[in-house]
Amino acid sequence: MKTIMFYEMAPDGLSKAMAHVDEHKARLKTFYERGVLLMAGPFANPAEGALGIFISKEAAEEFIRDDPFVTNGVVGNWRLVEWNEVLV
């Protein structure tokens, strides 16, 4: 089942993001190329966070576990929501 990952920025997350953005983007690219990340990106106002859509909860959890934005405090909170896609 597809899973949506929601990231919320830490209070000081934007100030930390630039130091880790290249590693974070490389991780996104790797998961996309593996076919387990369908799309991802920040909201129009990056301070509001970001989302990613994964093919499974396990893939999302694997991504989060070692994401530089999570391990370095850019992301303050995250949550996963399993999603029943209707239109394909």
Task: Label each residue range with its predicted role.
Residues 1-88:
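Conserved, structured core segments of small domains
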